[in-house]
């Protein structure tokens, strides 16, 4: 089975082949999966259930072959894997900024503005605790805030990995940023329901794009 990995703003996403990957592995919503890229041609996959207990590791038995892929994407062939679980969670973090040339800190200029001292809400603390077991000790998180100058006018936003999904980002009179015109369809398509907790990551590449973590 072959998938393509795309790097956007310091995070990796499966841009092609994800539906087939889910079908072949039997992944289910609400459970967790960890991808560990050891070399450009080798990938390990670890599985966790809802209680974060480790399942059987999905470790490939041979080297993976790199396939030709579009710019900023990597094609990786993955062997057949046993039934496992899935969490559609996009992790945005960075390694030590002094040693990692691919870290998110290298892309901070592409973000409208950022703050290392933003207040961390209980929901974000819980989110970090859930995925903390997957991260290296040097990993750092950045909470992105919107620059007032950037938000003087409404902005068109594209969903990462899809040029056809666009929404309108609007700043209300009480300084809240809202996604309008296209959000309802996007939420319904991606099973985002009332009371869902979402973390939004905005960046420019060169247009404003977004990834959404649903907790």
Swiss-Prot record:
The residue ranges flagged as biased composition, category Basic and acidic residues, are 95-107
- InterPro entries to which the protein is assigned, alphabetical: B3_DNA-bd, DNA-bd_pseudobarrel_sf, Plant_B3_domain
Keywords linked to the UniProt accession: DNA-binding, Nucleus, Repeat, Transcription, Transcription regulation
Q: Where is this region: Disordered?
A: 92-117
DNA-binding region ranges: 1-51, 123-215
Q: Which Gene3D superfamilies match?
A: DNA-binding pseudobarrel domain
Tagged with keyword Repeat: yes
Q: Tell me yes or no: is Cell inner membrane among this UniProt entry's keywords.
A: no
Q: What is its main location?
A: nucleus
Biased composition regions of type Polar residues, renumbered to the chain: 108-117
Cellular compartments annotated? Nucleus
A GO CC term? nucleus
Q: GO terms for molecular function, please?
A: DNA binding
Q: Give the protein's recorded name.
A: Putative B3 domain-containing protein Os11g0625400
């Amino acid at each position: 089975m072959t998938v393509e990995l795309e790097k956007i703003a310091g995070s990796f996403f499966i841009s092609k082949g994800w539906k087939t990957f889910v079908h072949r592995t039997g992944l289910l919503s609400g459970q967790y999966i960890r991808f560990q890229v050891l070399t450009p041609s080798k990938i390990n996959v670890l599985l966790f259930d809802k209680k974060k207990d480790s399942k059987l590791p999905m470790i490939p038995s041979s080297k993976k072959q790199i396939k030709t892929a579009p710019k900023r994407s990597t094609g990786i062939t993955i062997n057949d894997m046993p039934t496992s679980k899935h969490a559609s969670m996009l992790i945005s973090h960075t390694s030590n900024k002094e040693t990692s040339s691919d870290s998110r800190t290298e892309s901070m200029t592409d973000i409208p503005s950022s703050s290392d001292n933003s207040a961390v809400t209980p929901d974000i603390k819980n989110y970090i605790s859930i995925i903390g077991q997957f991260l290296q000790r040097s990993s750092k998180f950045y909470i992105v805030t919107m620059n007032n100058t950037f938000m003087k006018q409404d902005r068109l936003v594209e969903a990462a990995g899809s040029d056809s999904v666009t929404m309108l980002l609007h700043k209300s009179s009480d300084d809240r940023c809202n996604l309008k015109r296209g959000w309802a369809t996007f939420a319904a398509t991606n099973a985002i329901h009332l009371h869902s907790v979402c973390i939004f990551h905005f960046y420019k590449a060169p247009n404003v794009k977004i990834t959404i973590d649903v907790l």
